[in-house]
Swiss-Prot record:
Keywords: Ribonucleoprotein, Ribosomal protein
Domain of life of the organism encoding this protein: Bacteria
Gene3D superfamilies, alphabetized: Ribosomal protein L28/L24
Protein name in the entry: Large ribosomal subunit protein bL28
């Protein structure tokens, strides 16, 4: 699915634009998606992921190997 983080699963949300006169129109809040390459030492190769900034922080915290195990278990990669 497009515009979805491969690590966290975050996608677009729906909300309203609210003007000064309190008029409301529908809008979408898009996730902050970035394409990033990660060097996987155990596999001796680069892995390219489409992730949000929150997913990037999660990779910094857990490590790329732990994230890849989760992705493979879900069938993402």
């Amino acid at each position: 699915m497009a515009r979805v983080c491969q690590v966290t699963g975050k996608g677009p949300m729906v909300g309203n634009n609210v003007s000064h006169a309190n008029n409301k129109t529908k809008r979408r809040f898009m996730p902050n998606l970035q394409y990033r390459r990660f060097w996987v030492e155990s596999e001796n190769r680069w892995v390219r992921l489409r992730i949000t900034s929150a997913g990037l922080r999660l990779i910094d915290k857990k490590g790329i190997d732990a994230i890849l195990v989760d992705l493979r278990a879900r069938g993402e990669i």
